[in-house]
Swiss-Prot record:
Gene: efp
SUPFAM superfamilies assigned: Nucleic acid-binding proteins, Translation proteins SH3-like domain
Function, in words: Involved in peptide bond synthesis. Stimulates efficient translation and peptide-bond synthesis on native or reconstituted 70S ribosomes in vitro. Probably functions indirectly by altering the affinity of the ribosome for aminoacyl-tRNA, thus increasing their reactivity as acceptors for peptidyl transferase.
Biochemical pathway: Protein biosynthesis; polypeptide chain elongation
Protein name: Elongation factor P
Length: 185
């Protein structure tokens, strides 16, 4: 059991027979009245999100999540196929299940897939990925007074803001948690 007072981002719990993951939370202690935990959470089966205030002493059973490292193979219209590295079984996932992770995955990259009751529900890309810049504007000479950035499209289609010295064809390191440029490779 987990109490609402122990909610943190990424904590999973079961409420009314449905599994949820905490997306965001805020402990609130008003001047008058009892403290509460304002929580934004997502249903792991349907993908829908809700916001609700809980009493910190409210208790919920934990949702047991299984994780597997899998390899991203390819996408076919609306489905993204991942292969289990141990059994070689292919698992198709929808765009809702892969969410923003697909912006940072190239074919044959590894990712962590989370399962609840044998059903995949979330993809976590590696924390840092190396991607090739395929389109960006050339840097303007002399435009270095401050940390100037420009938009760059990488090979997966994601847009990353990079310093002006990064050019097309460069390979850059990106933090997938924030989508920020880290360095040139």
């Amino acid at each position: 059991m987990i109490s609402a007072g122990d909610f943190r981002k990424g904590v999973t719990f079961v409420m009314d027979g449905h599994p949820y993951v905490v997306i965001d939370f805020q402990h609130v202690k008003p001047g008058k009245g009892a403290a509460f935990v304002r929580t934004k959470y997502k249903n792991l089966k349907t993908g829908s999100t809700r916001e609700e205030a809980f009493n910190p002493s409210d208790k919920f059973p934990r949702a047991h999540i299984e994780t597997k490292e899998m390899q991203y193979l390819y996408n076919d219209s609306d489905l993204y196929y991942f292969m289990d590295n141990e059994t070689y079984e292919q698992v198709p996932l929808t765009l809702v299940e892969v969410e923003d992770a697909i912006k940072y995955l190239k074919e044959n990259d590894s990712a962590i897939i989370k399962f609840y009751e044998g059903r995949p529900f979330q993809v976590e890309p590696p924390i840092f990925v190396e991607l090739k810049v395929i389109e960006t504007e050339p840097g303007v000479k002399g435009d270095t007074a401050t940390n100037v950035t420009k938009a760059a499209t990488v090979e997966t289609g994601a847009i990353v803001y990079v310093p002006v010295f990064v050019n097309e064809g460069n390979i850059i390191k990106v933090d997938t948690r924030t989508g920020e440029y880290m360095s040139r490779v």
